[in-house]
Amino acid sequence: MDNVTCARILSDASLEILPLLDAAYQVRKHYFGQEVRVHILNNAQNGHCQEDCHYCAQAKSSTAEIEEYGMKSDEEMLQEARTAYNKGASCYCMVYAGRQASQARIDRLKRILAQIKVEFPDKEICVSTGFVTNQGAVELKQAGLDRLNHNLNTSESHYPNICTTHTFADRLNTLLAAKSAGLKVCSGMIVGMGEGYADIIDVAKRLRVLKAESIPVNLLVPIEGNVLSPQESNMSPDFILRILCLFRFLNPSSEIRVAAGRELHLRSMEVMALYPANSLFLQGYLNAKGSSNARTLRMIKDAGFSIKSELDLDELLKEQAPQQDLVSDGSKALLKGLKELRPAIQTK
């Protein structure tokens, strides 16, 4: 698909959204049927990051009031893995703050991975831990890691506008290291950081070349204290759905995830994202709250979709406790407290 056609999908109002969604859905259905893959994030180490990624509440450039803590214990990580899989997740994602995975962290991860795989040998594990060397990627693969996450976030030309402490090439090299080690790759972008059509198209095509197995499409979450705020003129539900369709057309067999910010930016059109996308997060994001598990699972069921799990969706819905479903105060995202960030331990 040439860039002119891609730009038309994003911008041409004469290409109505419903036919586009149907076309993307036919591709999605061919590869994934009616199945939705649920991922649950574990913010395994929060804050204290020396990178200045302008979109991130953990960055040194952010004044967001997050709950900071060091690496969670092995037992805490294992208990939260159990909880994630018992809530219907097909993939458990451990996310660590910081620039690069040290050898000490690699060794710690290898131990945690081995423990999780003993209990859940058939479940996917994804890790996001900054830059990873070729050797580090090989060691993680041998320890049982299925997938490494490292988002490109935006195009190479736009990258200096969102971060100055590392480069686009640094991120790309980590993805290449993961691929060379035989790991699956999870990499996507963040929409709403001042990028243009060309930047969106560039990321979608770059991920196609990389053969990224999983592609999260994040929508910039408005967190008080962060350098960047969403470019609202470019964040209509219609435009977001067009982006998801484009990613599906260019990456037909990849898992496309409607990721952070779906509740805030898609609003009443949120369920429509499941027609081009086949994956989402349950239980919120790294520091920002998401919709309740009950609401998300109900949305999946009501639209006629199923989840990739041996657990029954109806039974999961019955188990959900009533929760307040509030993700923002009207202008800024609500942040998680320790009760949500560290559910496996008792907090005072």
Feature names for model-found ranges:
Residues 1-30, 35:
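Terminal or standalone catalytic/regulatory effector modules within metabolic enzymes
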Residues 36-41, 92-94, 125-127, 148-150, ...:
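Hydrophobic faces of well-ordered beta-strands that scaffold small-molecule active sites
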Residues 25-26, 114, 245, 271:
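Active-site phosphate/pyrophosphate- and oxyanion-stabilizing loops and adjacent acidic/basic residues
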